[in-house]
Amino acid sequence: MRVLHVIPSVAPRYGGPSRAVVDMCRALREVGVETLIATTDADGEGRLTIDLGRETSFGGVPAVFFPRQWSEAYKYSRPLARWLGSHVREFDVVHIHAVFSHACLAAAKACRASGVPYVIRPLGTLDPWSLGQKSLRKKLFWHLGVRRMLDGAAAIHYTARPEQTLAEESLGLGRGVVVPLGVEVGSLNGASGFESQGRSVESPCRSPYVLVLSRLHPKKGLDLLLPAFLSTVKRPEFAEWKLVLAGDGEGEYVESLRRLVGRQGGEAHVIFAGWLEGEKRGAALRGAAALALTSYQENFGLCAVEALACGVPVVVSPHVNLAPEIEAAGAGWVTPLELDALTRTLADTLSDAGARARRGAAGRELVRRRFSWEAIARQLVSVYEVSRQEGHASS
């Protein structure tokens, strides 16, 4: 089986969705599926340094890149659209990752023209909260082709049941399937640091710390997490604790976070570590006492699963769609997005090393049972087979 994966960008700065598609293709190839990623060279305001217009390797999997010609938000690429129009018929199924992007609309249009079934993974963008952000632009896209793209899909791939429920109830969609994302446990687990060319990669902080490992974006709830954490560490018993922000975002927003920390006199307690990849990312995860993901909306939360795979408990909001599974497994703390409640939860987390160890162990078991890439790849193969046999893209 040949499956084409189309995504607007795979640059690390875009967080979990970009990383997940590379890991997904790697896992699919392990179970015998031939994959190719088609994407753009977008990397924020810059561009990835990579060959364009011909097959190359990215993250160890085959990929073909095209220039983003304009619009960081829309990532318009006429060369990508032309390539899709000529090549989608070479694949059994096309898996489209994202919705409000030129690459996605172009892929769906090419599939409909060629009679190739396609599956859409909306990345949480069909959640009512997400649709309410920059809503005028999304309404325009909706009428320009997003609704037709969704109606023509052989399946809509959600990564958590609440994501499916919210999208289907608010938009009247059907053909939904739930297949979670996975983690490559072997790439994360280890001792206190990765061994690399004879040296150990240290965690980003020698003091005990809570880790944020994601894009620095308004939806992540950092406007509440930062003051809650800084209030907590004013207590003498928590004075040595740090909050490590391992991520990047738009310059103006990151600067606003720095100002927030400065106004509260928290510079000694908050570390802006920047985006971490590879061995440094694994070391940061394993060294953390807990990971915080206090989002206003999170369709999956790959960084939380990565933390649990390392035996690190998580503090999440109810708006992280994995929160019910985390709570049921006893793998962390689910806290309302209210300043006082979040402050109390952080104090509970920091004060009880035994609880952190128990919840971390429960999290590791949850990942073993639910988030193995091998098992997930086989679930995806079933989705592709049904899509190929029962449904072709609408013309």
Question: Regions from the language model: what does each represent?
Answer:
Residues 4, 157, 197, 201-220, ...:
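Conserved donor-binding/catalytic core segment of Leloir-type glycosyltransferases
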Residues 41, 162, 182:
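Carbohydrate-associated surface elements
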Residues 41-44, 213, 242-256, 274:
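Glycosyltransferase donor-sugar binding loop
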Residues 139-156:
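Membrane-proximal helix-turn-helix segments that form the acceptor-binding/catalytic region
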Residues 255-276:
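Nucleotide-activated donor-binding/catalytic signature segment of Leloir-type glycosyltransferases, i.e.
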Residues 296:
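Aromatic "clamp/platform" in nucleotide-sugar-dependent glycosyltransferases that forms part
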Residues 313-317:
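Short hydrophobic beta-strand element within catalytic cores of glycosyltransferases
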Residues 332-340, 348-354:
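Conserved acidic donor-binding segment of nucleotide-sugar-dependent glycosyltransferases
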